[in-house]
Regions:
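Glycine-rich, highly charged phosphate/nucleotide-binding loops
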Residues: 54-71
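Hydrophobic beta-strand scaffold residues
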Residues: 38, 60, 99-100
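Alpha-helix C-terminal capping/helix-to-coil transition sites in glycosyltransferase folds
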Residues: 12, 71-73, 119
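Short loop/edge segments at beta-strand edges and connector loops
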Residues: 42, 60-64, 104
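Adenosine-phosphate binding glycine-rich loop
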Residues: 116-131
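ADP-ribose/adenylate-binding Rossmann-like module
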Residues: 75-81, 86-111
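Hydrophobic, well-ordered beta-alpha structural blocks that scaffold small-molecule cofactor pockets
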Residues: 1-52
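A generic structural signal for well-ordered alpha-helical segments
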Residues: 53, 58, 89-93
């Protein structure tokens, strides 16, 4: 076992998601179920994320990621198709001891998220440890 399975309480906790496409959407929808306080940084948003923004379920900054964007999130998710941005997000978060997940890049992650089966009150996460 290379990773320790853990469930984290994100209720009203700040989470930063970098990216505004379909991959980011999937992560954000899971974070919304966890009642996290989500900030999204992206150059553009998919239709569904614009809808969540309109409903004030997410806070959005239409801009490029910068190192100083990492102010107090409890975790960070990079969900962009830009390898340089993903690497910068990972290095910056790790330097600040903020847990970071870079989608589809396990070598840049300090945590991974398993596949989830939610049959409330039963919640099951399954992982191949990034493989």
């Amino acid at each position: 076992m290379k990773s320790f399975p853990i469930f984290i309480n994100l209720i009203h906790k700040p989470v930063l998601v970098i990216g505004g496409g379909d991959v980011a959407l999937r992560k954000i929808e899971m974070l919304l179920k966890a009642d996290a306080k989500i900030t999204v940084i992206a150059s553009s948003l998919c239709k569904e994320l614009k809808h969540y923004q309109k409903l004030k379920k997410i806070h959005v900054k239409i801009k490029s990621f910068e190192k100083n964007d990492l102010t107090h999130p409890v975790l960070v998710i990079a969900a962009t198709d830009n390898k340089k941005v993903n690497l910068l997000v990972s290095k910056t978060a790790q330097a600040l001891n903020i847990p970071v997940n870079v989608v589809d890049e396990p070598s840049l992650c300090t945590f991974t998220m398993g596949s989830i089966i939610d049959r409330s009150p039963l919640l099951i996460a399954i992982s191949s440890e990034g493989n």
